[in-house]
Amino acid sequence: MNVGSNEEAETLRHLFGVRWPLVVRYVEWLSTAGLERGLIGPAEVDRLWERHIANCAALAPLIPVDQRVIDVGSGAGLPGIVLALARPDLEVLLIEAMSRRTAFLREVVADLGLRDVTVENSRAENVACTAPVVTARAVAPLPRLVKNVAHLLEPGGVLLALKGARVWQEVHAAEHLLAKLGYQPGVEVLTVRAVAGQLTVQRDADASNDRRWATVVRVIKQ
């Protein structure tokens, strides 16, 4: 398991700053207890940094300062714990429906000393609180996701969903649902890349995977 290319390592170290040792410890959690408890597949252990940590860290520059964030379907803490490590100014609520995953999250949060991170064992549909930012990764296709989290977003709040190769198919399938669910019209597709040790964000960028860390869908609540 390695951090990836020199540029990826430089960018990650810059992003996490003094919390870098905590990120390393979190990766150790994922590759040991996370693997043993079935939260991380065996094939993922050697690519945790580039496929998971870097991918989740790409959300960090998209969130304004001092925000409350609800991370739905947190699983092993991706992206919620990564965000909390990269952005200590954020207050993060991790929502996870499976008890064994919730137990793992609570152990990790306690071990890393993340005081502004709370874990709730619940389905997103049953959560009553709201936040200006909701994040999601590998939770559901976009049409179902925008429906399940609409009640969690404050007016003007933003849903940030990490997506893969089928992003445009999901966007087209979800667009007709936005108005009836209380979202603003239109979906933004953002590409986050590492350039010269910094993360850059482009809107509707080309499909090239060169230096791409993540593809993020951004939807805004009315």
Swiss-Prot record:
Q: Which domain of life is it from?
A: Bacteria
Q: Which residues bind S-adenosyl-L-methionine?
A: G73, L78, A124, E125, R137
User: Where is this protein localized, as stated in its record?
Assistant: Cytoplasm
Protein keywords = Cytoplasm, Methyltransferase, rRNA processing, S-adenosyl-L-methionine, Transferase
InterPro entries, per this entry? rRNA_ssu_MeTfrase_G, SAM-dependent_MTases_sf
A GO molecular-function descriptor: rRNA (guanine-N7-)-methyltransferase activity
| GO CC annotation terms, alphabetical | cytosol
What are its E.C. numbers?
A: 2.1.1.-
The record ties this protein, via Pfam families, to:
GidB
Determine if rRNA processing is one of this entry's keywords.
Answer: yes
Known NCBIfam families for this protein?
A: rsmG_gidB
Q: What does this protein do?
A: Specifically methylates the N7 position of guanine in position 518 of 16S rRNA.
Show the HAMAP family listed in the entry.
16SrRNA_methyltr_G
Q: Name the family.
A: Belongs to the methyltransferase superfamily. RNA methyltransferase RsmG family.
This one is known as: Ribosomal RNA small subunit methyltransferase G
